[in-house]
Amino acid sequence: MTALTSAAIVGGGLAGCECARKLARAGIAVTLFEMKPHSFSPAHSSPELGELVCSNSLRSDEPEAGVGVLKQEMRALGSLVMEVAEATRVPAGKALAVDRGLFAASMTAAMEAEPGITLIRREITSLDDPALQGFDAVVIAAGPVASESLSRSLADAVGATHLYFYDAIAPIISADSVNMEKAFWGSRYRPEDTDYLNCPMNREEYFAFREALVEGEKAATKDFEKELHFEGCMPIEALAERGEMTLAFGPFKPVGLDDPRTGRRPFAVVQLRTENLNKTMFNLVGCQTKLKYGEQDRIFRMIPGLEDAEFVRYGSVHRNTYVNAPQVLNGDQSLKNRPDVFLAGQITGVEGYVESAANGMWLGMMLAARKHGENIPQPPVECALGALAAHLRTPVKKFQPSNINFGLTPELNQRARKKDRKALYAERARENFTQWYALLPASARS
């Protein structure tokens, strides 16, 4: 095992920034390459690092949710993303939502201020780019929409064809364009909350909207790409095509959202989530889409209260690129045929911002240990971080990206009612993580 003194990281997203700080604080000289603002992916528009596409991208903060458990583990391990998220948090019920602009600006400031990190605004187009020569390790953390040239280089290196699916982004509208005579505030079973704005639908309005979604014109995909949808990012029109009531029993379910004007539960409810601290923008919850922009104007304005909606950002679709991790990556996330090149974040096959950040942090911990010739034991599969790591190591017939969920962990060794199982999984995860954490060298705990 060769000690590391220098590393290049390609990509200033959550995974790249997490990895960079871990390495820098271990005394490793880090050069962080970010192609923005000279070049942008289809999913990004800000020159800042750590750009999120949605204020609620960090998802649930409940201690018994899989992603909530992962966040707890990340906080214990000194996660940069968790620190910045807490500092830029906005009210969102049980979710960890942030002011996206403040979050990205804070991530950028953290990288620029960290001793040992040199930020270079330059696009890396190949694993053999001259700018990457001379480093002890190269980390590719270019995200799910890596540039075509870098993706081709990576495909050549792993010797396998990339797999593609589409992440669909929900529209954002201006708050002052919402008709408040039709919308009402409240979270499920918590009518006093002002984290969500709700647009109630009657039966006729729901079915007319659902029909418009099904018939709406969608953005075209490239001929050479096969379209696959990850369940967690299913476009709303794809859900609508599954059945007449799929939306009403899914993202538009009215449970716990009685209309205070009528005292009755609507047939369906479209929720709007605040996008920033000032509540000047709202995200249409569950309305991620690949409808053409003109169709978004027409169809989403069919929602009661949104007849005059002003779109701050339209929904869109972007490619997600990832490798078949069990086949092409070693346990330390290095390429099997290029052991000096490591992958981090969503390109490995973890799915989601929190998961990508955790993966980058974990890679940073493993590489930082090499500075002192140490080994860090793999986290137990019963905890969230270990379950994600095991997902990338476990050979399967058809490898697909995965969020953190308790289904990635072993079955419970006891019988339990369905409503109690999450709590038991979460408690087991905490116990196993605590035992593993005690084995870590002090340098790996911060």
UniProtKB/Swiss-Prot annotation:
Its EC number is 2.1.1.74. GO terms for molecular function: flavin adenine dinucleotide binding; tRNA (uracil(54)-C5)-methyltransferase activity, 5,10-methylenetetrahydrofolate-dependent. Its cofactor is FAD. NCBIfam families: gid_trmFO, PRK05335.1. Catalyzes the folate-dependent formation of 5-methyl-uridine at position 54 (M-5-U54) in all tRNAs. GO terms for cellular component: cytosol. It is found in: Cytoplasm. It catalyses: uridine(54) in tRNA + (6R)-5,10-methylene-5,6,7,8-tetrahydrofolate + NADH + H(+) = 5-methyluridine(54) in tRNA + (6S)-5,6,7,8-tetrahydrofolate + NAD(+); uridine(54) in tRNA + (6R)-5,10-methylene-5,6,7,8-tetrahydrofolate + NADPH + H(+) = 5-methyluridine(54) in tRNA + (6S)-5,6,7,8-tetrahydrofolate + NADP(+). This is Methylenetetrahydrofolate--tRNA-(uracil-5-)-methyltransferase TrmFO. Keywords: Cytoplasm, FAD, Flavoprotein, Methyltransferase, NAD, NADP, Transferase, tRNA processing. It comes from the Bacteria. Belongs to the MnmG family. TrmFO subfamily. InterPro entries: FAD/NAD-bd_sf (IPR036188), MnmG-rel (IPR002218), MnmG_N (IPR040131), TrmFO (IPR004417). FAD binds at G11, G12, G13, L14, A15, G16. GO terms for biological process: tRNA methylation; tRNA wobble uridine modification. PANTHER family: GLUCOSE INHIBITED DIVISION PROTEIN A (PTHR11806), METHYLENETETRAHYDROFOLATE--TRNA-(URACIL-5-)-METHYLTRANSFERASE TRMFO (PTHR11806:SF2). Pfam families: GIDA (PF01134).
